[in-house]
From Swiss-Prot:
<dbReference type="GO" id="GO:0042717">
    <property type="term" value="C:plasma membrane-derived chromatophore membrane"/>
</dbReference>
<keyword id="KW-0830">Ubiquinone</keyword>
<feature type="transmembrane region" description="Helical">
    <location>
        <begin position="200"/>
        <end position="220"/>
    </location>
</feature>
<protein>
    <recommendedName>
        <fullName>NADH-quinone oxidoreductase subunit N</fullName>
        <ecNumber>7.1.1.-</ecNumber>
    </recommendedName>
</protein>
<feature type="transmembrane region" description="Helical">
    <location>
        <begin position="234"/>
        <end position="254"/>
    </location>
</feature>
<comment type="similarity">
    <text>Belongs to the complex I subunit 2 family.</text>
</comment>
<dbReference type="InterPro" id="IPR010096">
    <property type="entry name" value="NADH-Q_OxRdtase_suN/2"/>
</dbReference>
<feature type="transmembrane region" description="Helical">
    <location>
        <begin position="38"/>
        <end position="58"/>
    </location>
</feature>
<dbReference type="GO" id="GO:0005886">
    <property type="term" value="C:plasma membrane"/>
</dbReference>
<feature type="transmembrane region" description="Helical">
    <location>
        <begin position="398"/>
        <end position="418"/>
    </location>
</feature>
<feature type="transmembrane region" description="Helical">
    <location>
        <begin position="445"/>
        <end position="465"/>
    </location>
</feature>
<keyword id="KW-0874">Quinone</keyword>
<feature type="transmembrane region" description="Helical">
    <location>
        <begin position="300"/>
        <end position="320"/>
    </location>
</feature>
<comment type="function">
    <text>NDH-1 shuttles electrons from NADH, via FMN and iron-sulfur (Fe-S) centers, to quinones in the respiratory chain. The immediate electron acceptor for the enzyme in this species is believed to be ubiquinone. Couples the redox reaction to proton translocation (for every two electrons transferred, four hydrogen ions are translocated across the cytoplasmic membrane), and thus conserves the redox energy in a proton gradient.</text>
</comment>
<feature type="transmembrane region" description="Helical">
    <location>
        <begin position="8"/>
        <end position="28"/>
    </location>
</feature>
<dbReference type="GO" id="GO:0050136">
    <property type="term" value="F:NADH:ubiquinone reductase (non-electrogenic) activity"/>
</dbReference>
<dbReference type="GO" id="GO:0048038">
    <property type="term" value="F:quinone binding"/>
</dbReference>
């Protein structure tokens, strides 16, 4: 390993060393008594690394192509690190007051983030699998963090069992690809794939690879775990599931299809378009009957991942750019929405029933309006930023020749808007009921308001995010 190669992986190495160091520190100094300092130290460490990575330049590889450090990886890592730090910060009060703030919690989040950083920089099937499993193993544990709850334990077990199945599918696909290509590096695989023609063995391998990765983004028909895990996990953990891991998996799909199978976009574009449509419609239709806001956010996530996959299905740099923009905006919307969900309490106990929001506009108009903005943005109502995110994805798909798919996407978006607008109806026109507690920690309130402001102001100026996404996409698709 040369000095140049080591410098490329330095952020991942530093974060891994930090995780192992604070794990030992926590064990030796009283475990949960140091949970809050570890949580805040972890958030600050990830923000510092995001700044360092964001200032990086160039497109390089390390370890014989196992690790790729390009603009696409840097953009994805910055968003992952910032979103993970935000979720940690806004979860401190919630976890502490419910006795869930154990010192392992922030460490598991950090280890999952290390795995995600490996995923977006993977240049080989082996590094892909290592990153994916590091993320998954940490998330299996954190889903069942509430050990005295049967629902939380069930969520963790269900996620583990189905996640193991998806890992098996991915490994089978990787073995097929290696068997027919004779190499595990993406740069080697793409030399085997002929322009416009994909050998049948590699096609089957690609299908199984995409099936394994589709599980991670909750794409239909690999979405079965999502509603139960979102509902059963502690709410801050659900917020984490809905943000950083989704971008990491989506970025990994983009890396695989463009770096390893970029010669045949027509083959995998059809697969991704089918997954996208199925996800959009199931998420939109199944969410209509939900009465629990965490389950509703699960189906919302499934539908939104369909739009992200539609951008990738285009098979162009514009498609990757639209996906990165969409996922970034989606993460901001979710951070703000979950900041509000964390504050939903009645008589000091958390509530997640949507009906609990009845006439919130009368008791807390500022929070109600901020949530209205975020819900309108999630629904894709102009002039909110969420509308422009969907517009960018649909425009990229039309530019790639998928005319009928964007039309179907618009219909799915209209159907899905119903359950967001139903929440707005409850807040402004619902029946009178026992009000929610007015308590909301200042940090959670700040995340809620800032996310709402971003959805309004971002339509005017995205503060350089659009240009950064364009440069990131150009570094991947060349």
């Amino acid at each position: 390993m040369t000095k140049a190669e080591f410098s490329l992986v330095l952020p991942e190495v530093l974060l891994a060393i930090y995780a192992m160091g604070v794990l030992l520190f926590g064990v030796w100094t009283g475990k949960d008594r140091v949970a809050k300092p570890i949580l805040w130290a972890s958030a600050v460490t990830m923000l510092a690394l995001a700044l360092i990575i964001g200032l990086g330049t160039g497109n390089d590889t390390a370890f014989g192509g196992l690790f790729i450090a390009d603009g696409f990886a840097r953009f994805s890592k910055v968003v992952i690190l910032v979103s993970a730090a935000a979720v940690l910060a806004m979860s401190s009060d919630y976890m502490g007051r419910r006795g869930l703030l154990r010192f392992e919690y922030p460490i598991l989040i950090v280890l999952a983030v290390v795995g995600m950083m490996m995923m977006v920089s993977a240049g080989d099937l082996m590094s892909l699998y290592i990153g994916l499993e590091l993320q998954s193993l940490a998330l299996y544990v954190v889903a069942a963090l509430r050990r005295d709850s049967a629902v939380s334990s069930e969520a963790g077990l269900k996620y583990f069992v189905l996640g193991s199945l998806s890992s098996g599918l991915l490994l089978y696909g990787a073995s097929l690809v290696y068997g027919f290509a004779g190499t595990t590096t993406f740069s080697g695989i793409i030399t085997v794939v002929e322009q416009g023609h994909l050998p049948i063995g590699l096609l089957f391998g690609l299908v199984f690879l995409l099936a394994g990765l589709a599980f991670k983004v909750s794409a239909v028909p690999f979405h079965m775990w999502t509603p139960d895990v979102y509902e059963g996990s502690p709410t801050p953990v659900t917020a984490f599931f809905a943000t950083a891991p989704k971008l990491a998996a989506m970025a990994l799909i983009a890396r695989v299809v463009h770096d390893a199978f970029g010669q045949v976009p027509g083959e995998w574009g059809q697969i991704l378009a089918a997954l996208a449509l199925a996800s959009m419609y199931l998420g939109a239709i199944a969410g209509i009957g939900q009465r629990d806001i965490k389950r509703l956010m699960a189906y919302s996530s499934i539908s939104h991942m369909g739009f992200g996959l539609l951008g990738l299905a285009a098979g162009t740099a514009a498609g990757v750019e639209s996906m990165l923009l969409y996922m970034t905006i989606y993460i901001v919307m979710n951070v703000g929405t979950f900041a509000f969900i964390l504050s939903m309490e009645r008589d000091g106990k958390p509530v997640t029933e949507i009906a609990a929001l009845n006439m919130l506009s009368k008791t807390d108009p500022v929070k109600a309006f901020a949530l209205l903005v975020l819900l309108f943005s999630l629904a894709g109502v102009p002039p909110m930023l969420g509308f422009f995110a969907k517009f960018a994805v649909i425009k990229a798909a039309i530019g790639a020749g998928f005319v009928w798919v964007p039309v179907a996407a618009v219909v799915a978006s209209v159907i899905g808007a119903f359950y967001y607008l139903r929440i707005v109806y409850f807040m402004y026109f619902g029946e009178k009921s026992a009000p929610l507690d007015g308590r909301m920690p200042a940090l959670q309130f700040a995340f809620l308001v800032l996310a709402a402001v971003a959805m309004l102001g971002g339509a005017i100026n995205m503060a350089g995010v659009e240009g950064a996404a364009q440069a990131a996409a150009a570094s991947l698709v060349n």
